[in-house]
């Protein structure tokens, strides 16, 4: 069993190192993609070979997403989405990886998940609602101003809140997003600009067939939960090794067939309200 832990403060990577790792990941994934040509037979042979390696996370997510495209998107009730997975992790006290880079994973994920309702974003939105969206009166706004004045600014969505304009902009975008989702719901990723923060809401399926939220899209998920939306679009981007092997054995499927079967099972399991669940 792999040991998976969150990074300690002194182990966290700089932004530059994260960018370098991301570019290397994209290059490797592109080479594999071109080699496979997304032929079903080659695809299953490649995935089988990766499954036989002793690694905790494997097969680049972009390979799977390029093959299945929109087939990985389902609609779920956000009431079921209660846990976040961390992004940068340490495996067996040596390898530092980003969980979002890989479509399959192994090991125990309990130590790398956290409650969405205890997240800063969730608390920010409750705080905003308590002051009727008058963000300059909110506790978090005042806290970020105080940190700015002490030369210890907060970073939100890859932006440093080191000026009043930056802090105001963050809260104004948050409120605009809240109002948009309240009016239109959560839109699919292909309905807006291809920006990093507008990627589809990614979810993972653990060894028990339960869903967790992948890093990113925190504001959209929190807003949808607090607004009690009935459904939101999400994209399956990580599946536990034990669960897909269980589905393969149960239904006598190859890897590609098992992925689509899991998509179907997750849609059936998580699209209805909990009160209607049998």
Predicted segments — roles?
Residues 1-7, 25, 36, 43, ...:
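Extended hydrophobic/Leu-rich segments
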Residues 1-30:
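Boundary detector for helix-to-coil junctions that initiate low-complexity/charged tails
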Residues 16, 20, 28, 118, ...:
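Short amphipathic alpha-helical segments that mediate assembly, nucleic-acid/protein binding
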Residues 23-29, 33-40, 47-86, 92-95, ...:
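A short, basic-hydrophobic beta/loop patch
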Residues 35, 42-43, 48-49, 143-213:
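Short alpha-helix boundary/capping and kink motifs at helix termini
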Residues 104-164:
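Extended, charge-rich helix/loop segments that form flexible
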Residues 137-140, 166-169, 173-176, 246, ...:
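Exposed alpha-helical structural elements
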Residues 240-278:
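Amphipathic, charge-rich alpha-helical segments that serve as recognition/docking helices
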């Amino acid at each position: 069993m792999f040991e998976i832990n969150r990074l300690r403060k002194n182990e966290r990577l700089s932004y530059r190192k994260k960018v370098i790792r991301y570019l290397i990941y994209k290059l490797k994934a592109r080479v594999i993609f071109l080699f496979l040509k997304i032929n079903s037979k080659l695809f299953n042979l490649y995935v089988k070979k990766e499954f036989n390696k002793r690694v905790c996370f494997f097969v680049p997510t972009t390979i799977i997403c390029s093959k299945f495209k929109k087939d990985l998107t389902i609609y779920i009730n956000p009431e079921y989405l209660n846990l976040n997975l961390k992004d940068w992790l340490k495996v067996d006290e040596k390898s530092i990886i980003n969980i979002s880079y890989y479509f399959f994973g192994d090991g125990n994920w309990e130590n790398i998940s956290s409650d969405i309702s205890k997240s800063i974003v969730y608390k920010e939105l409750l705080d905003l609602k308590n002051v009727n969206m008058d963000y300059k009166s909110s506790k978090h706004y005042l806290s970020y101003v105080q940190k700015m004045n002490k030369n210890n600014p907060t970073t939100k969505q890859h932006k440093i809140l080191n000026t009043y304009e930056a802090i105001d902009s963050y809260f104004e975008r948050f409120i605009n997003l809240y109002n948009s989702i309240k009016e239109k719901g959560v839109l699919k990723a292909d309905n807006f600009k291809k920006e990093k923060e507008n990627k589809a809401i990614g979810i993972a399926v653990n060894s028990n067939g339960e869903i967790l939220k992948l890093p990113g899209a925190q504001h959209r998920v929190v807003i949808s939960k607090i607004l009690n939306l009935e459904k939101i679009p999400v994209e399956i981007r990580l599946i536990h090794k034990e669960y897909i092997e269980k589905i393969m054995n149960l239904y006598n499927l190859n890897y590609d067939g098992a992925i689509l079967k899991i998509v179907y099972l997750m849609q059936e399991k998580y699209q209805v309200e909990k009160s209607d669940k049998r």
